[in-house]
Amino acid sequence: MNRNRFIYFTDLMLVPVFILSFYTGVELHIAGQGVDHESWHIWAIFHTNASLLFMILGIIHVKSHWAWYKGLKTVGCKGKRKAVLLLSIVFLLAVVSGILLVCFVDGANSSLGLWHYRIGIFAVSYTHLTLP
């Protein structure tokens, strides 16, 4: 597979994997409100795996388009560029908070988990409002 097809495939896969990550995150949040810990645990595993795949694809995506990010210094950050940069920052916050959750928080209903959930909701809302 040549480089352009690989980039296209990676970019294309980001959409369904993001939807899966978001859906499993919402289900995880809902399961955390209940008393069935097994259900929460299953959703936590599913969400972690979907989000790990999303993170890997995101890293490949950013690496593939690194020249665009570097070009922001000279071209400036206006219009759609500003929206894409802010979206990148929001996704980075979601990834960092998710990694912190996996590494340092045990169980449901943590304050960091709630912030991670809010960041995810904001990411979906912002994506929906700014990108075509």
Model-derived regions, located:
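Membrane-embedded alpha-helical bundles that constitute the cytochrome b-like, heme-associated redox core
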Residues: M1-L129
